[in-house]
Amino acid sequence: DIIQGTLAKAFGTIGGYIASDDLVCDAIRSTASGFIFTTSLPPLVAESARASIEYLKSNSELRIKQQENVKFLKNELLKHDIEILKNTTHIIPVMIRDAELCNEISKHLLDNYGHYIQPINYPTVKKGEERLRVTPGPFHNKKMMLDLVDSLEKTFRKFNFTKTSINAA
């Protein structure tokens, strides 16, 4: 078995990891181009990742608060007929389905409302599945999330973007 994961999302650092038996790990170290042509994580980054893992293992309140915020924001987006993909993660994909429009909406949200919402376009996703990646955190409050929904509504109107919710969260 091989277990792999990222340190860049929930742990707030960079890099990733694999866990397996010695034979598999040695084979990956010797043959994987992504490993051969990279460098080790700086000690500060490795320690930050270790500290994040230790903290999250023993403190569930931030995870619980983030899950509550994700549920709240998904429900608000659906109430406003904003199409999101159904999933079980903390990332809420707001479907735009057009790369140029996705970039324009993202830029408009930042320039006019101060919301940095990452556009996700091809080749990360298939053409026609372009989306905005919304990630509520544990320190967002309801007012912030409602402001985001309002900003999305206004931006969609400005760009004459028709939104239809096809998935329940």
Q: What do the PLM-derived regions correspond to, one by one?
A:
Residues 9-11, 45, 96-98, 124, ...:
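Glycine-rich beta-alpha junction loops
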Residues 9-10, 84-86, 126-129:
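Short, flexible turn/loop "capping" segments at secondary-structure junctions
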Residues 19, 93-95, 135-137:
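Short hydrophobic/aromatic beta-strand micro-patches
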Residues 120-121:
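Cytosolic Rossmann-like ligand/nucleotide-binding regulatory domains
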Residues 2-4, 11-60:
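Conserved core segment of the aminotransferase class I/II
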Residues 50-112, 116:
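Conserved PLP-dependent catalytic core of the aminotransferase class-I/II
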Residues 111-112, 124-169:
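PLP-dependent enzyme catalytic core of the Aspartate aminotransferase-like
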